C-alpha cells in the first residue's frame, strides 16, 4: 500500500498523511482527530513506510559499509559484531563484505557498497600504502575510516592497534624463554601492519644473539601458514620458540604439528597476535596479545557518526589502541 492510498482512505491530503506517519503532526498543527483517522488506516492495513526511499529523499540510506579481509578471523568478526550492534542501536544498518585479503576483491567490495549508496565506509585494507585506489576520496567529504590497517594519514582517519609497540612488548616477553631456535612467522610483508609488527619484533630482539628464521606466507589465512610451515619443516627442525603475527598463522602451525606429531612440544614457547581461551588447554607456554574489540568498535563508529552528523569529512590522523597481553597454556596455571 502506498501513501496516496492511506491518504485517500483517511480522507486527508497526501501531505497531511505524510506529516502524521513521519511524526510531524504537532509540528504542522495537525489535529488529534485527523491523526487518529490516519493512524487507524495505518494500523488496519499494517502500513510501514519505506525507510530506504525516505533516506534516499533525504540524501541518506542510514547504512554503513564494512570491508574486512577475513570472516574466519575472530578478531575481525568480534569487531564486526560490536559495530553491527552499536550501529543498529543508532538506527544504522551495517553491510559487511569480505575481501579475502585480495586487493582486487577489496576494490570490488568498495564499488559495490558505493552502488548501494552507503553513507560511509569502514575498511581494513589489503592494499599497500602506495596504492592509488583510495586517493580519489582524499579531498572528498565522503567518510572512509580505516580499521586495523591504516590508510594515508594525511587524508584519512585510521583506528589501529599499536602494532609496533605491541610486537615489541610480545617479543620482549618471548625473549625470557631459553629457546635456542626461533621462528618468526608473518604474512604479506608489503602491508603496513606486517611491517610494523616485524619492526617491533626486531627492536626487541636486536641485542639477542640467538638467530631468528623469518618466514612470510602469501596471505594471513590458516591454510597458507600450514603449507608454508610444512615445507619449512622439510629442511628445519621444530623451533623451540615461535612468534606469529596473527592467530590464523598460529592455527596453521598447530594443524601441521598435530598431524605430524599428535601434539605440540611442551617446551615450545609461543607468542602470537590474537587470543583464544582454548589456548589455556595447551601444555606449552603461550603469550597472546588481543585487541580491545569493544574499544576499537566504539571509536570507529564514533568517528563515522560524527562525520555524518556534521556532515564533514573525518579529521585525518591515526588513533592507536594498545592490546592486552594474556598468559595462556601452562602459564595460565602457574
Swiss-Prot record:
Protein name, UniProt field: Catabolite repressor/activator
Coiled-coil residue spans: none
InterPro entries linked to this entry: Fruct_sucro_rep, HTH_LacI, Lambda_DNA-bd_dom_sf, Peripla_BP/Lac1_sug-bd_dom, Peripla_BP_I
BP terms from Gene Ontology: regulation of DNA-templated transcription; response to fructose
Keywords: Activator, DNA-binding, Repressor, Transcription, Transcription regulation
Domain HTH lacI-type: 1-58
Subunit structure: Homotetramer.
Native source organism of the sequence: Salmonella typhimurium (strain LT2 / SGSC1412 / ATCC 700720)
Keyword Transcription: yes
GO molecular function term, any single one: DNA-binding transcription factor activity
Lineage: Bacteria, Pseudomonadati, Pseudomonadota, Gammaproteobacteria, Enterobacterales
Residues within the DNA-binding region(s): 3-22
CDD domains named among the record's database cross-references: HTH_LacI (cd01392), PBP1_FruR (cd06274)
Function: Global transcriptional regulator, which plays an important role in the regulation of carbon metabolism.
Pfam families, A to Z: LacI, Peripla_BP_1
Disruption of the gene: reported phenotype: Decreases expression of genes encoding virulence proteins. Decreases virulence in mouse.
Amino acid at each position: 500500500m502506498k501513501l496516496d492510498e492511506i491518504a485517500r482512505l483517511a480522507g486527508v491530503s497526501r501531505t497531511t498523511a505524510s506529516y502524521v506517519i513521519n511524526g510531524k503532526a504537532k509540528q504542522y498543527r495537525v489535529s488529534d482527530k485527523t491523526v487518529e483517522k490516519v493512524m487507524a488506516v495505518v494500523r488496519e492495513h499494517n502500513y510501514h513506510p519505506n525507510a530506504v526511499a525516505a533516506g534516499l529523499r533525504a540524501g541518506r540510506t542510514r547504512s554503513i559499509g564494512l570491508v574486512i579481509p577475513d570472516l574466519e578471523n575472530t578478531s575481525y568478526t568480534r569487531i564486526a559484531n560490536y559495530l553491527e550492534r552499536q550501529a543498529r542501536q543508532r538506527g544504522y544498518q551495517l553491510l559487511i563484505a569480505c575481501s579475502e585479503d585480495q586487493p582486487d576483491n577489496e576494490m570490488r567490495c568498495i564499488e559495490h557498497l558505493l552502488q548501494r549508496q552507503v553513507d560511509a565506509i569502514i575498511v581494513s585494507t589489503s592494499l599497500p600504502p602506495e596504492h592509488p585506489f583510495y586517493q580519489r576520496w582524499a579531498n572528498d567529504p565522503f567518510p572512509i575510516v580505516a580499521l586495523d590497517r591504516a590508510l594515508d594519514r594525511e587524508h584519512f582517519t585510521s583506528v589501529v592497534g599499536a602494532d609496533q609497540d605491541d610486537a615489541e612488548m610480545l617479543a620482549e616477553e618471548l625473549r625470557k624463554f631459553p629457546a635456542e631456535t626461533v621462528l618468526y612467522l608473518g604474512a604479506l610483508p608489503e602491508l603496513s601492519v606486517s611491517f610494523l609488527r616485524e619492526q617491533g619484533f626486531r627492536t626487541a630482539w636486536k641485542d639477542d644473539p640467538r638467530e631468528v628464521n623469518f618466514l612470510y606466507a602469501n596471505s594471513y589465512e590458516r591454510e597458507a601458514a600450514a603449507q608454508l610451515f610444512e615445507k619449512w619443516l622439510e629442511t628445519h627442525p621444530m623451533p623451540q620458540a615461535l612468534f606469529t603475527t596473527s592467530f590464523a598463522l598460529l592455527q596453521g602451525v598447530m594443524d601441521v604439528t598435530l598431524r605430524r606429531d599428535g601434539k605440540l612440544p611442551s617446551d615450545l614457547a609461543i607468542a602470537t597476535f590474537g587470543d583464544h581461551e582454548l589456548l589455556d588447554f595447551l601444555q606449552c607456554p603461550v603469550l597472546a596479545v588481543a585487541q580491545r574489540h569493544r574499544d576499537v568498535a566504539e571509536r570507529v563508529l564514533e568517528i563515522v557518526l560524527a562525520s555524518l552528523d556534521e556532515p564533514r569529512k573525518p579529521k585525518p590522523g591515526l588513533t592507536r589502541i594498545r592490546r592486552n597481553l594474556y598468559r595462556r597454556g601452562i602459564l595460565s596455571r602457574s
